């Protein structure tokens, strides 16, 4: 058995199937499990997905929000057990895969048009 096939078999059991479809430009709310000492709580992080990267078990996405006038970005693994759930709030219409240009924009310049979705 080739090494790639072995890795695929091992990681296939760890892939999550409850992840909704989302891409760059979409507004999401990520429910992340945070461990503080012996306590565990769920922290919500809501913002715009500025990029998705990779495939399979190593796939990640970065969410950006503005908190108290400061831009905050967090990168989450797509298939992480630390992410409780992902809610897609808005589907954005963008023409780029990576929205790094949002880092230089503030206020109304960061708005993204909504994408039509056929059910």
Swiss-Prot record:
<keyword id="KW-0687">Ribonucleoprotein</keyword>
<dbReference type="GO" id="GO:0006412">
    <property type="term" value="P:translation"/>
</dbReference>
<protein>
    <recommendedName>
        <fullName>Large ribosomal subunit protein bL19</fullName>
    </recommendedName>
</protein>
<dbReference type="InterPro" id="IPR008991">
    <property type="entry name" value="Translation_prot_SH3-like_sf"/>
</dbReference>
<comment type="similarity">
    <text>Belongs to the bacterial ribosomal protein bL19 family.</text>
</comment>
<dbReference type="InterPro" id="IPR038657">
    <property type="entry name" value="Ribosomal_bL19_sf"/>
</dbReference>
<comment type="function">
    <text>This protein is located at the 30S-50S ribosomal subunit interface and may play a role in the structure and function of the aminoacyl-tRNA binding site.</text>
</comment>
<dbReference type="InterPro" id="IPR018257">
    <property type="entry name" value="Ribosomal_bL19_CS"/>
</dbReference>
<keyword id="KW-0689">Ribosomal protein</keyword>
<dbReference type="GO" id="GO:0022625">
    <property type="term" value="C:cytosolic large ribosomal subunit"/>
</dbReference>
<dbReference type="Pfam" id="PF01245">
    <property type="entry name" value="Ribosomal_L19"/>
</dbReference>
<dbReference type="InterPro" id="IPR001857">
    <property type="entry name" value="Ribosomal_bL19"/>
</dbReference>
<dbReference type="GO" id="GO:0003735">
    <property type="term" value="F:structural constituent of ribosome"/>
</dbReference>
């Amino acid at each position: 058995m080739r090494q790639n096939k072995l890795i695929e078999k091992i990681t296939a059991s760890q892939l999550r199937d409850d992840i909704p479809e989302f891409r760059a430009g979409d507004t999401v709310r990520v429910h992340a499990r945070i461990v503080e000492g012996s306590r565990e709580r769920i922290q919500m992080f809501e913002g715009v997905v500025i990029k998705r990267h990779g495939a399979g078990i190593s796939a990640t996405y970065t969410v950006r929000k503005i908190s108290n006038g400061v831009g905050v970005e967090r990168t989450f693994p797509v298939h992480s057990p630390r992410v409780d759930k992902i809610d897609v709030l808005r589907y954005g219409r963008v023409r780029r895969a990576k929205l790094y240009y949002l880092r230089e924009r503030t206020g109304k310049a960061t708005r993204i048009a909504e994408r039509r979705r056929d059910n």
